[in-house]
Amino acid sequence: MALSTFKREHIKKNLRNDEYDLVIIGGGITGAGIALDASERGMKVALVEMQDFAQGTSSRSTKLVHGGLRYLKQFQIGVVAETGKERAIVYENGPHVTTPEWMLLPMHKGGTFGKFSTSIGLGMYDRLAGVKKSERKKMLSKKETLAKEPLVKKEGLKGGGYYVEYRTDDARLTIEVMKRAAEKGAEIINYTKSEHFTYDKNQQVNGVKVIDKLTNENYTIKAKKVVNAAGPWVDDVRSGDYARNNKKLRLTKGVHVVIDQSKFPLGQAVYFDTEKDGRMIFAIPREGKAYVGTTDTFYDNIKSSPLTTQEDRDYLIDAINYMFPSVNVTDEDIESTWAGIRPLIYEEGKDPSEISRKDEIWEGKSGLLTIAGGKLTGYRHMAQDIVDLVSKRLKKDYGLTFSPCNTKGLAISGGDVGGSKNFDAFVEQKVDVAKGFGIDEDVARRLASKYGSNVDELFNIAQTSQYHDSKLPLEIYVELVYSIQQEMVYKPNDFLVRRSGKMYFNIKDVLDYKDSIIDIMADMLDYSPAQIEAYTEEVEQAIKEAQHGNNQPAVKE
């Protein structure tokens, strides 16, 4: 129960009383990766997140661990090479949250990609990204392209490229990395905001003053080094330090829409260019839905709640109907949406899509380290870079030595399945185990595929008598209880949006079962009547934002 909601008080007691080699501010994928790398090396690590884990950018991506084909278009060769190699590592270390997905790249007359350039581009991509033989690109004729996805626009179609991307659940990837870090000894807590830094007599950062957002308690965490990994909030965090540099972020917003496959029967993931501005976007089938995105527009409004506007929805509907003209989707067909912010490093005079996705480490005179920019795919390598630097500083300043990075072959939580090649066999073996408990085969397969080597704990929850009084389907009940016991879920939206993904990919379950879920959480976590009211309102607000176009200007008025 290393990351249990029931251990919050125990974790807070340790955070108050101990001194840490490293305190990390930010509980997205970057912070999680740093916590895992540092704790695996033997550092004493603490991590604080002001909202829920992955609530910022790390639950709002296109949900691909991809090699970045579009960066080849911009001649960012190094980015392609590194992300391609990292992608393979991310998959191997957690095949339960990442899965290979063949991607179709249709080529139309006058489109971004011609046959020759696509063949050369994908070939270069294979070589740079170190793509394994079975996943190397294929070039398809017009007939073969339509056989893969008959909905693709036939007019002007010349053929297609076929290559592999990796689909992931970004929020679950984050929580699995976080859980493994906690197993390695990291003290990790959500709903805890860093307010100020503390300094020693030499004006070096030596701690963080925090506030528990659930109880309003204030306390100080003592640290030898502090890393700011706050994503879109890194500038806000740095503003509390006297020694910041002149670098800054430029935020852009990306939006996705979700449509049921009864309306948009997409059978094949497609990467295509839009008619309006030539931007490349994805259409990806998942769990009986198709999701499409993303947009890329400058954003300077409330960081904690970027919203999908009607303009965003219209843009993506137009893009779908342009590339898949027979489906005729309308705004009413959108079941759910999400919007996320990319924390990019400011480059003067560049359009949103032109700004590099590279990451940088900034070191202030105060000793505060900030990691900015970067991509989901590169989280492990980014962590390695900054923890190498932390290790160097701890040796120089304190004479401490730690082992080198060891995350390349380190499975994340749930990833102990005998490697990616064995994953399918592992799942079937767990399905057989579940049959002995009387658990439905399809439910067992979904749970084993999603939770990997942690699935036995969910099967055990299924044996408890409380389930029968819960008014919930077994699958939802065991996921909910597990997420409270093992994944620090405190509010209903933590579960509905981030641990289960239902707010995006099965909003009907949210509408049908939200009241029962809140009842169970109120009972398990001893909510007050005021909390029940507040959290119910938060769920209703999240549903509204997901289902409708919102009137949110790009710049705060």
Swiss-Prot record:
GO aspect biological process, one term: glycerol catabolic process
PROSITE patterns in the cross-refs: FAD_G3PDH_1, FAD_G3PDH_2
Localization (cell): Cytoplasm
InterPro entries in alphabetical order: DAO_C, DAO_C_sf, FAD-dep_OxRdtase, FAD/NAD-bd_sf, G3P_DH_FAD-dep
Essential cofactor(s): FAD
Coiled coil ranges: none
Entry's Gene Ontology molecular function annotations: glycerol-3-phosphate dehydrogenase (quinone) activity
Residues binding FAD, per UniProt: 21-49
Pathway terms, separated by semicolons: Polyol metabolism; glycerol degradation via glycerol kinase pathway; glycerone phosphate from sn-glycerol 3-phosphate (aerobic route): step 1/1
Enzyme class: oxidoreductase
Entry GO terms, CC: cytoplasm
Pfam families with a match to the protein in the record: DAO, DAO_C
Enzyme Commission number: 1.1.5.3
Enzymatic reactions: a quinone + sn-glycerol 3-phosphate = dihydroxyacetone phosphate + a quinol
Keywords per UniProt: Cytoplasm, FAD, Flavoprotein, Glycerol metabolism, Oxidoreductase
Coarse class of the protein's main subcellular location: cytoplasm
Superkingdom of the source species: Bacteria
Family: Belongs to the FAD-dependent glycerol-3-phosphate dehydrogenase family.
Protein name (database record): Aerobic glycerol-3-phosphate dehydrogenase
